């Protein structure tokens, strides 16, 4: 693998790795997912370590959410208990990092409308992590902290209102909280 590859889903190594994982999982291509993804997995892990260790400017777009999604996919697909525990701890560390380092714009409405609103995408990923059973108590506390901030901002654009309502219903359904 060459150096200086992007770690984003839409135009980077993480998207390629998720695509390869999909092809292997559904038998479009033959092979062992751990063997095929070994180099990419190592590269993403090193990139994640660099991202987590370095302080960046507040306006810098980091691939932490994309890396988190990649490791959730790997966690679901892996069978070895040691790797599963490793990915579980890494997932927990990544979502805590994202939550702790969120910016002021995390709760602000996006103009123009965007499907990739970080706060909503993060909530959907938290629900996904909650469903697979990683750090459910911590995620419950995060959701309780986010709830008042999220519902105190009333989106002006109808599409943003609909997106907020949809994400809130999804969260409420999967964590069994009727207040959402």
List PLM regions with ranges:
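Glycan-recognition and catalytic cores of secretory/periplasmic carbohydrate-active enzymes
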Residues: 1-180
């Amino acid at each position: 693998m060459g150096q200086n590859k992007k770690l984003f889903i839409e135009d980077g190594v993480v998207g390629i790795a998720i695509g390869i994982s999909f092809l292997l999982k559904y038998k479009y291509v033959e092979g062992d997912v751990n063997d095929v993804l070994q180099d990419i997995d190592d590269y993403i892990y090193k990139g994640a370590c660099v991202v987590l260790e370095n302080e960046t400017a507040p306006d810098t777009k980091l691939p932490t959410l994309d890396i988190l999604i990649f490791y959730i996919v790997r966690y679901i697909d892996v069978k070895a208990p040691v790797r599963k525990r490793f990915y579980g701890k890494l997932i927990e560390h990544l979502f805590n990092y994202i939550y702790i380092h969120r910016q002021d714009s995390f709760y602000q409405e996006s103009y123009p409308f965007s499907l990739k609103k970080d706060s909503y995408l993060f909530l959907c990923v938290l629900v996904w992590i909650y469903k697979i059973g990683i750090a459910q108590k911590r995620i419950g506390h995060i959701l309780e902290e986010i709830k008042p901030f999220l519902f105190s901002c009333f989106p002006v654009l109808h599409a943003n209102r609909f997106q907020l309502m949809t994400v809130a219903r999804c969260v409420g359904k999967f964590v069994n909280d009727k207040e959402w």
